[in-house]
Amino acid sequence: MRIALGIQYDGAAFCGWQSQPHGKTVQDALERALAEFAQTSLHTTVAGRTDTGVHGLGQVVHFDTDLDRADFSWVRGTNAFLPSTVAVQWAKPMPDTFHARFAAFERTYYYALYVHPVRSPMLAARAGWVHTPLDVDAMREAAEHLVGEHDFSAFRSSECQAKSPVKHLYQIGIRPDGDFIHFRFRANAFLHHMVRNLMGCLVAVGRGRYPASWLAEVLESRDRGCAAPTFMPEGLYLAHVGYPAEFAVPPAQLGSVPWSSVWADLDGRP
């Protein structure tokens, strides 16, 4: 039997998603909890591995098991053994054709950026921060150069293991909201550090260091050295993983963050 789980977690509490010998990752915490509840080892496959500091609102995993438990039993039973910084939101039996990673056709990330002369301790692990105003119109113009199917080599980490740097970036939405600017990135898939590298470049344009057309030059160069430094992880949220309707994957619960209404308005999609 294949079971899918919807997971939320505070990325600041973990050293990324992928299991490590030190055991301080989200995958390690989840698999320990599953083992306690199921009384057997269960290996999880994830939709998208996130880095240290990156949060998960709509993460999806699957595992195979011979155990027959009610859906909500998996939720409550696993959560009983998880730390407060990670929680299973839903559980659902799936056909063998479902795969958390390979069945997904799109991913959506949001970035919450606090723009203020003084940093906020209350937002230290929840939002990125810049101390100077940003030109939103310039960033929007720059983002237009990135939308579409491109070779995103200039925005991939040197540690990226993706077979191809070609991805289809469907949308970049940018919306100011008081002292915040919110960003929405939706694509069929993302390279390692791709969203944070895009953020670094957009912020550089917003600060006036480069014109909006610079993003087209960086993209065309396919050279990571031509782009801005990787932006901080704290404001980044994996919010949604899209699957074919036949799997009826439950939607992510974005209401757990204070900016959910702003995010929903970026283009009218969850």
UniProtKB/Swiss-Prot annotation:
It catalyses: uridine(38/39/40) in tRNA = pseudouridine(38/39/40) in tRNA. Homodimer. Belongs to the tRNA pseudouridine synthase TruA family. One of its GO terms (molecular function) is tRNA pseudouridine(38-40) synthase activity. This is tRNA pseudouridine synthase A. It comes from Burkholderia thailandensis (strain ATCC 700388 / DSM 13276 / CCUG 48851 / CIP 106301 / E264). The active site is at residue 51. InterPro entries: PsdUridine_synth_cat_dom_sf, PsdUridine_synth_TruA, PsdUridine_synth_TruA_a/b_dom, PsdUridine_synth_TruA_C, TruA/RsuA/RluB/E/F_N. GO terms for biological process: tRNA pseudouridine synthesis. Its EC number is 5.4.99.12.
